[in-house]
Regions:
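Active-/binding-site microenvironments in catalytic and ligand-binding cores
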Residues: 1-97
Length: 97
């Protein structure tokens, strides 16, 4: 929970993780971290009036040959109505001159 607040403070809008979920495996479906990331009141499933452009991509695979660093992210999201949609993130390395 504290980590997700820090991620929000940093201004992260597109979160990509190599885990099955950003929430605890057994949280009784509360999805606390998802709610924090999307500014949804805990215990509620009502989305705020403002549309969030934040995304979470779980279960990504990044080969070991990809170095830590700064990248541009191009994310392809299928036009899909629902609470989850498949995506295809592509990263491009940035060189700081």
């Amino acid at each position: 929970k504290n980590a997700m607040h820090k991620i929000k403070e940093m201004g992260v809008t597109h979160l990509l993780v190599d885990m099955p979920t950003i929430d605890f495996s057994y949280d009784d479906g509360r999805l606390v971290n998802h709610h924090i990331f999307w500014d949804i009141d805990q215990g509620s499933h009502k989305v705020n009036e403002v549309i969030s452009h934040n995304t979470i991509t779980e279960m990504i695979f990044v080969p070991n040959k990809i170095k830590d660093g700064n990248y541009l992210l191009q994310i392809h999201i299928i036009n899909f109505t629902g609470d989850a949609a498949p995506s295809r993130p592509i990263i491009y390395p940035l060189e700081i001159i």
